[in-house]
Amino acid sequence: GATLDAWEKVVDATDESERAALVNEMLAATTAHPRMTNHVGSGWHLHYRDDGRPLGAVLSSLISVGTALHLTGRGMHRLSRCAVAECAAVFADTSRTGRQRYCSQRCANRDAVRRHRARGVPPVR
């Protein structure tokens, strides 16, 4: 839907300013003023949306706020696509060093094997 299309534009943004502008557009379109709530006795927490919104609107709000919190808290570069050309998966880099390149260990291993084979080293038997 429209939310995921907008989110993919954030992922594919070429610089921090563009990424921030796109996230700000998502926030403006999907969120309300933040407020504290303790509905149904679930404990105090923040809501970034109006009560009674349909599920799609709630999810759009969560995606935009979550993305903004991740990028401002972890770093603007920590949202990316997998480095494996055949994989278009998106991942949020939560690594300690901020240098995650792959969406999964499987893709990291596949790319390591591809690079090893490209060097022309005969397989160990």
Sequence positions of predicted segments:
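Short metal-binding segments enriched for Cys and/or His
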Residues: 110-122
